[in-house]
From Swiss-Prot:
Residues 106-118 are annotated as: Important for membrane-damaging activities in eukaryotes and bacteria. One of its GO terms (biological process) is arachidonate secretion. It is found in: Secreted. PANTHER family: PHOSPHOLIPASE A2 (PTHR11716:SF100), PHOSPHOLIPASE A2 FAMILY MEMBER (PTHR11716). One of its GO terms (cellular component) is extracellular region. This is Basic phospholipase A2 homolog 1. CDD domains: PLA2c (cd00125). It comes from Laticauda colubrina (Yellow-lipped sea krait). SUPFAM superfamilies: Phospholipase A2, PLA2. InterPro entries: PLipase_A2, PLipase_A2_Asp_AS, PLipase_A2_dom, PLipase_A2_dom_sf. The keyword Transcription regulation does not apply. The keyword Zinc-finger does not apply. Belongs to the phospholipase A2 family. Group I subfamily. D49 sub-subfamily. Disulfide bonds join 11-71, 27-117, 29-45, 44-98, 51-91, 60-84, 78-89.
Amino acid sequence: NLIQFSQLIQCANKGKRPTLHYMDYGCYCGPGGSGTPVDDLDRCCKTNDDCYGQAEKKGCSPLSTNYNFDCFPGGPQCGKGTTCQRFVCDCDLKAALCFAKSPYNNKNFNIDTKKRCK
């Protein structure tokens, strides 16, 4: 679920950037998504959106699925669970690790998506 995704992000980036900074970034970070991603970080969000789409095709509900994960010094790791729990955790884990390695560009926060995301 979104709370766990937020915690995964914080674990992966070691608390360097608040999760809220990722909730309205580029064309894909946040609700919806369209057009061409504006940068690598936005591509992470598009990949996560696509992964959620695959989860839904498997009958999972990615926004409300609770899953288990651990935050180790080397980064987060998904725990055991049902097929849906594992799949959604893997989606979020990949995104969180992608966020942690992608540069954050302040000019892509809270952009005019109607103009820039065609």
